[in-house]
């Protein structure tokens, strides 16, 4: 039976009560915040296998240098079965600046994670081909970081 995005978000929260913040709905969209980024892969696998989020539409990152957890990663997931979209967010510190790759769960994560690595410097553990995608090897900066010299 098809579910609403709110129903699915509440199921996610019920399954991971200690690490998923209360889902936030705004204008028909639903955002779930993962409080423990070390468990990203486990949560993403549950979303794919148990809640039918079979497509990663987009992965991106936000640089907030004044926060202790400087980088926020944002994943836009889509369920073709339920016909709903869910946003999953988690934050990491600049050091070590690493998070699990989701490329083994969704093939679409491969190049998106490479782009985040190239432009923000975030490392994706267990990525099959983590190398720069836009800038050349040896380029000393990550152009989307706030301290990028203009």
Q: For each predicted feature, which ranges?
A:
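Terminal low-complexity/charged segments
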Residues: 1-150
């Amino acid at each position: 039976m098809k579910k609403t995005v709110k129903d699915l978000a509440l199921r996610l929260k019920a399954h991971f009560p200690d690490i998923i913040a209360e889902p936030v709905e705004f204008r028909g969209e639903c955002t779930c915040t993962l409080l423990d980024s070390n468990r990203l892969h486990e949560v993403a696998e549950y979303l794919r296998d148990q809640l039918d989020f079979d497509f990663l539409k987009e992965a991106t990152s936000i640089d907030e240098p004044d926060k202790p957890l400087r980088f926020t990663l944002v994943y836009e997931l889509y369920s073709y079965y339920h016909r709903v979209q869910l946003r999953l967010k988690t934050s990491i510190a600049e050091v070590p600046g690493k998070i699990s790759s989701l490329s083994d769960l969704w093939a679409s994560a491969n190049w998106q994670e490479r782009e985040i690595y190239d432009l923000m410097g975030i490392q994706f553990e267990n990525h099959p081909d983590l190398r720069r995608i836009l800038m050349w090897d040896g380029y000393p900066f990550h152009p989307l970081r706030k301290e990028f010299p203009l």
